[in-house]
Amino acid sequence: MERQRHRAFVITAAIAALAVVGGAHRAGAEQGIDLDGLTLRQAAAELCAGKITSKALTSAALARAKATGNLNAFITLDEAGAMKAASAFDAAHTRRSACKPLGGVPVVIKDNIEVAGLPSTAGTPALKNFIPRKDAPVAARLRDAGAVIIGKTNMHELAFGISGYNAAFKSGPEPGVRSAYDSTRIAGGSSSGTAAAIGTRIVTAGLGSDTGGSVRIPCALNGCASLRPTVGRYPGEGIAPISHTRDTAGPMAATIADVAVLDRVIAGGGPIAPANPKEVRIGVVAAMLANLDDDTDVAFRAALDKLRKAGVTVVDVDMPKLADLNGQVGFPVALYEAYDDMVAYLKRTGTGITIEELAKQIASPDVKGTYDGLVIPRKLPGPDNSVVDGKPAYDAAMKTARPALQALYRDTFTKDRLDAIAFPTVPKVAIPANPESSSLANFTLFIQNTDPGSNAGVPGIQVPVALGATSKLPVGLELDGPSGSDRRLLAIGMALERIFGRLPAPSAH
């Protein structure tokens, strides 16, 4: 009953908001805290110095979350738990205890990543009552570093999509997680709510997960920064899966410098300094410049010009057979592994829910079609709208195509002496939020550039570069680097964001 009353309150607050962005701005201003300009590093420093309290910052974040309820960014908003954690930080801080890296900083966690005591739905109705008893390791590391978890964020159902148009969970009048910059547009996915919460300046940081673009696509559409780490860099336990070969948790934040803080908390290592732009060599692959809308094309080319002027070496490179190899890996691996990985996960939850029961309750037509037609029967799309057995294609992908794709990346970085390849994270700015946003055509388009690196297992960062000249919506640039080069990639990203500057807040443009 308490959770029902809380949900009713959130929905009422969302509908009552006369102006979402204006109301969000006032929610922060009333606390004397500039949420619009705050970064994770600044928040941690000011909390440590005693310039602000965690109670004030957390209260401001919660107020803005309620004021922006029609964005559907949250599935669960844990006001009581967050304020308790914030108060505990403030009490400890008065005793001059050492400051932790995230001490007192409000963060959000995607709802397929387990947090003790809060529902972990993976955005699907069958799991709405699953409440884990312990944190997933990635969430535990943020909490151990002092983070205050204010809630679990909405997502594309079961992480199987790029739009975030999920009808199963909403706090506003219309379904689908909405863009921080235009509530009629998609937030992207599948880590939709985390990106929307950061873009709306509710929080400065959070966690998502990424199989084929799910921390990078929504950050590109909401003006935030993110890292898809090298597969295996972060622990994957306690996260509702798609594919053990491709899945990884990923940090999302206001800036790449903030992402670097989260990476250190999760993976360890010392501070990361920005790279010298004059010592950075970046390749551009022509095939990744296909299907761009005008705003993305203009913004990306302008970003490359800025990099050249700052001393970055930018060269054209060729990656032959990239699309062909990627096609032989992507769907065969994700769709085939999804069955066994989800069965194992459901068993571990102890809910007694079977994968068939899970599929029966799926609310999103696109995801239900994928589960019923492909995942459950272990099939793959075939020619002329047919389906074929998934096992032969999966075996071929793992034995031949994926190693060849990894070799292509490795050889390209080595032969052309590249630190990274650069490309528009997504080909278009955010599209209208409606059921059609989850179409197969849109899915294929939006993963065009993020999917290949995912299948190769290499790290990638998303850096905001501009607002589109016509749309005034965020445009992002991605850098993919060699396997294991996560820290070098973050250093380059920190240098790049100094060149590009931070995007204006939604209330300021």
Residue ranges and their predicted role:
Residues 67, 148, 199-290, 301-310, ...:
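Structural helix-boundary/capping segments
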Residues 12-21:
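Bacterial N-terminal signal peptides
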Residues 102-122, 279-281, 336-404, 462-473:
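Short helix-loop capping/hinge segments that flank enzyme active sites or metal/cofactor-binding pockets
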Residues 30-211, 230, 302-305, 310, ...:
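Gly/Ser-rich catalytic/binding loops embedded in alpha/beta enzyme cores
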